[in-house]
Curated annotation (Swiss-Prot):
Gene designation: PAC1
GO BP terms: cell division; establishment of mitotic spindle orientation; microtubule sliding
Record keyword Mitochondrion present: no
Organism: Pyricularia oryzae (strain 70-15 / ATCC MYA-4617 / FGSC 8958) (Rice blast fungus)
Database matches in InterPro entries: Dynein_regulator_LIS1 (IPR017252), G-protein_beta_WD-40_rep (IPR020472), LIS1_N (IPR037190), LisH (IPR006594), PAC1-like_LisH-like_dom (IPR056795), WD40/YVTN_repeat-like_dom_sf (IPR015943), WD40_repeat_CS (IPR019775), WD40_repeat_dom_sf (IPR036322)
Repeat region (WD), residues: 114-155, 157-197, 201-248, 251-290, 295-355, 357-396, 401-444, 446-461
Classification lineage: Eukaryota, Fungi, Dikarya, Ascomycota, Pezizomycotina
Protein name: Nuclear distribution protein PAC1
Domain notes: Dimerization mediated by the LisH domain may be required to activate dynein.
Keyword match Cytoplasm: yes
Length: 461
């Protein structure tokens, strides 16, 4: 048999084997091999054996790591090949110019570092190029995502910051944060992020917050209401102008991990450790649990309501002849779970599709503003893009988005353009009729991710 090793390599291998046998108390085998190879005690003494000790194990583990890396690269190559196979020159050109078809590139524009612990949450300012991140280091950091620079660090919470969100009345945008210290805090970006109010009331960690939208146009507008979700199993609705809790909603039987309001502020979608997704109707005096969706096999980490732009694609999954009216809300929704799956639901609580592909907990998801795609991130360190037009097929996987678990994902809200004037209305601030068209919203092709690796990454066109 012809050896593929050089004489020098063969000698090194023999010495490593003898050292391995000696270190594992197989002295007779080591002596027999030394004798057969002609390695006398003066040639292969104790010092030499010590030098080669552990070499076999190191080589073995290196091979295992290389095999895993090869498998990961093959998987990524297959995903890229699949994406290429599904693309045409026209679709590729369109993706580069049409914001409704934009998907993030594999490499981020910026990788921002300053936090000293896990980043749990991120939120974009609805107008400016600011983004906030909250961390287990108990701080909130404000960054300029266009320049990739840290603007300021906010220190006030005494426990990990679990969620952040921008919103509030037009002309009075606020930043809200919530924490394991049981409080919600409001910050004024126009006054150097001064803490203007602290909202106590929850009896356990406050895990999620969102400003309640005030219109169904899809614009980045919200009013004075804020909703929070907590480990105390309640949802609370707050008036940020007074700091009062207006409603407490009960129904979940375990930790509520996420909450998502509809564009018109009429509905809330919530989910958590009771493995249910619940839709609440806020249009009545006492909020009603309109739907309870059951299907996941583990805790549910995240949920989202689909924008009207997704209705044409999701209605086909639902078997509808035509999509619901764009003015309706809460027609379709998605949930991501520790069972590694994403589920799509309709307004009747029917499970439309289970998206399988992640290899670990699904931590966050967001619908593409263009409507065709759903994006998700996971503890498997990937970002996946699911094409709703192709029956929810995963058409793009970005591997190693972070070095460790990916914890959060947000899409920059669209920029509200000037509202169109109509024959019976004006665009100078005078009252308009209710039939007026909604203002146009320009999609910003910017997303951000945060991770246990303490890095905030910006993906932009």
């Amino acid at each position: 048999m012809t050896s593929i090793l050089t004489p020098r390599q063969a000698e090194e291998l023999h010495k490593a084997i003898i050292a391995y046998l000696s270190a594992n108390n197989l002295s007779s085998s080591a002596t027999a091999l030394r004798t057969e190879l002609g390695l006398a005690e003066d040639v292969f003494d104790a010092a030499t054996a010590k030098k080669y000790e552990g070499l076999i194990e190191k080589k073995w583990t290196s091979v295992v790591r290389l095999q895993k890396k090869i498998m990961d690269l093959e998987s990524r190559n297959n995903a890229l090949q699949s994406e290429l196979d599904n693309a045409t020159p026209l679709s590729l050109a369109k993706r580069n110019t049409d914001p409704t078809a934009w998907l993030p590139a594999p490499r981020p524009r910026y990788s921002l570092e300053s936090h000293q612990n896990t980043i749990n949450c991120i939120a974009f300012h609805p107008v400016y190029s600011s983004i906030a991140s909250g961390s287990d280091d108990c701080t909130i950091k404000i960054w300029d995502w266009e320049l990739g620079e840290l603007e300021r660090t906010i220190k006030s919470h005494t426990r990990p910051v679990l969620d952040v969100d921008f919103g509030g009345p037009r002309g009075g945008i606020l930043l809200a944060s919530c924490s394991s210290d049981l409080t919600i805090k409001l910050w004024d970006p126009s006054d150097d992020y001064k803490n203007i109010r602290t909202l106590p009331g929850h009896d356990h960690s406050v895990s999620a917050i969102r400003f309640m939208p005030s219109g169904a146009s899809g614009a980045a507008m919200s009013g004075n209401l804020l909703v929070s979700a907590s480990r105390d199993m309640t949802l609370k609705i707050w008036d940020v102008s007074t700091g009062f809790c207006l409603k407490t909603i009960r129904g979940h039987t375990a930790w509520i991990r996420d909450v998502y309001p509809s564009l018109d502020g009429r509905y809330l979608l919530s989910t958590g450790d009771d493995s249910t997704v619940r839709l609440w109707d806020l249009s009545v005096t006492n909020p009603e649990n309109r739907l309870t969706m059951i299907g996941h096999d583990h805790y549910i980490e995240c949920c989202a309501l689909a924008p009207p732009s997704s209705y044409p694609f999701l209605s086909r999954l639902a078997g509808l002849k035509k999509p619901p009216a764009a003015t309706s809300t809460a027609e379709f929704m998605a949930s991501g779970s520790r069972d590694k799956t994403i589920k799509l639901w309709d307004a009747r609580g029917t499970l439309l599709k289970t998206l399988i592909g992640h290899d670990n907990w699904v931590r966050a998801l967001v619908f593409h503003p263009g409507g065709r795609y759903l994006l998700s991130v996971s503890d498997d360190k990937t970002l996946r893009c699911w094409d709703l037009e192709q029956d929810g097929k995963c058409v793009k996987t970005i591997g190693d988005v972070h070095e460790r678990f990916v914890t959060c994902l947000r899409w920059a809200p669209g920029v509200v353009m000037d509202a169109p004037a109509e024959a019976d209305g004006q665009s100078n601030g005078t009252p308009r009729k209710k039939t007026e068209a909604a203002p146009a919203v320009r999609i910003r092709c910017v997303i951000a991710t945060g991770s246990v690796d303490m890095k905030l990454r910006i993906f932009a066109n």
